[in-house]
């Protein structure tokens, strides 16, 4: 499973802004903006059944993200 964690849209992202500014300095003027995040690849023993999805959702909410300033997306596959 993959957990992607991103700052909420209303939260200022200085790292993303720094990357976007660097893109412009490198001549990549078509880059309008960048938001940086985190990606976690979680390996499971056994199938990604409902119990596993629930467990990884809890892990993402309680450990991998800060729900006050971040959202997460879980990709099962």
Model-derived segments and spans:
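Non-catalytic terminal accessory/regulatory regions of metabolic enzymes
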Residues: 1-77
